[in-house]
Amino acid sequence: MWHTAKITVDTEHYCTSTTQMAMAQMYGVIFDHEPKNKTMLCACPGTELHEMGARMVADLFENDGWDTIYLGAAVPKNALLESVRMNQPDLIALSVTMPQHLIDCKKVVDAIREEFPDVKIAVGGKAFESTDEIWKKWLIDLYTNDAREFLKRANEIVMDK
């Protein structure tokens, strides 16, 4: 909302940190589902700092029984690839809010596809909403701007190990 001058940057940061604290306090209360033996790695690639949506998606998957590896904001390509090597996720979810970070996201997608051609890749975030479905050209397995739909479709495309 700061980019439309509805609130200031400091107000946005305050609201974000308050929301993150509330989410963290709920963590032990809501995550009690049967494990699904599926792993999802979630990150904001490059210099993307807006991680709230990615955090919420990771928590939604965790609540559904997935193991989640949440790397957070501004994850460099090489660090993300190393995490994929170590954790061997079934699904990699990349979140981009600001359009200028789409280039970094594309580089990460290309690197993942080159080294891990069979892993499922999903993208999401506000930046993709005005791109005329650019994700379709990126060999992406899943895109939606709805978290519940994302979880439903992820469960369909990722089979049990």
Residues of each region from the PLM?
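Long amphipathic alpha-helical segments
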Residues: 1-31
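Conserved hydrophobic helix-helix packing surfaces used for dimerization/oligomerization
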Residues: 38-40
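Short hydrophobic segments within beta-strands
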Residues: 43-45, 95
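A general structural motif
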Residues: 46, 50-52, 71-78, 103-104
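Short helix-loop-beta junction
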Residues: 55-69
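Cofactor-cradling patches in redox/metallo enzymes
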Residues: 60-63, 75-133
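Residue-level detector of anion-binding/catalytic polar loops
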Residues: 67, 90, 141
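Peripheral docking tails and interdomain loops at the edges
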Residues: 127-161
